[in-house]
């Protein structure tokens, strides 16, 4: 199976992935690093300044699902606290799936993607930072509403030429992560 097909398949679990991150963001038992990474992952999904524009045919959503997996892997080195079982399962699955990104990008480019994802924990999107989301229920509610709108607008990812899509995906990431 082509890498792009694996990445495409990750979009199928987007709703449960978002729910897992919401659980982590709201957890009073998780450490601040984990919660900020959760906020960063969710904010990335509504950001218009992501690595690959969402309108880019076939690959526009792939960076979104990649960032979810990289952030999940980053949370493994922090205390996520006691989460609902389904959230824990989803976060561990995503963290394990990040290995597929390493296989596709190679360790050097993956390390740049990982560094980019880590920096997102300190960046505001649409006037909301991950730290603010940890403390402000109204900000979380607004973000969750935007995420729901994004999910409603999402359409199936169509890739007619997997080789071309993989080349474009790697080219975008190589260029943006210099």
Model-derived features: positions:
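Membrane-inserting effector segments that mediate pore formation, membrane fusion
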Residues: 41-68
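Conserved GTPase G-domain substructure that encodes guanine base recognition and part of the catalytic core
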Residues: 10, 72, 152
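A structural signal for well-ordered alpha-helices, especially hydrophobic packing surfaces
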Residues: 22-25, 46-49, 72, 76
């Amino acid at each position: 199976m082509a890498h792009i097909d694996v990445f495409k398949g990750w979009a199928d679990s987007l709703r449960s992935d978002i729910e897992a991150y919401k659980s982590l963001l709201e957890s009073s038992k998780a450490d601040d690093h984990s919660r900020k990474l959760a906020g960063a992952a969710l904010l990335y999904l509504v950001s218009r300044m992501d690595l690959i524009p969402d309108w880019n045919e076939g690959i526009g959503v792939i960076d979104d699902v990649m960032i979810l997996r990289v952030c999940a892997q980053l949370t493994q080195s922090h205390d996520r606290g006691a989460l609902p079982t389904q959230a824990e399962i989803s976060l561990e699955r995503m963290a394990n799936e990040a290995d597929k990104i390493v296989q596709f990008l190679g360790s050097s480019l993956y390390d740049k993607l990982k560094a980019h994802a880590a920096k997102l924990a300190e960046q505001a999107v649409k006037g909301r930072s991950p730290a603010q989301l940890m403390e402000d229920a109204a900000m979380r509610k607004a973000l969750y509403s935007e995420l729901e709108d994004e999910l409603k607008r999402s359409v199936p990812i169509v890739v007619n030429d997997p080789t071309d899509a993989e080349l474009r995906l790697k080219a975008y990431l190589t260029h943006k992560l210099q």
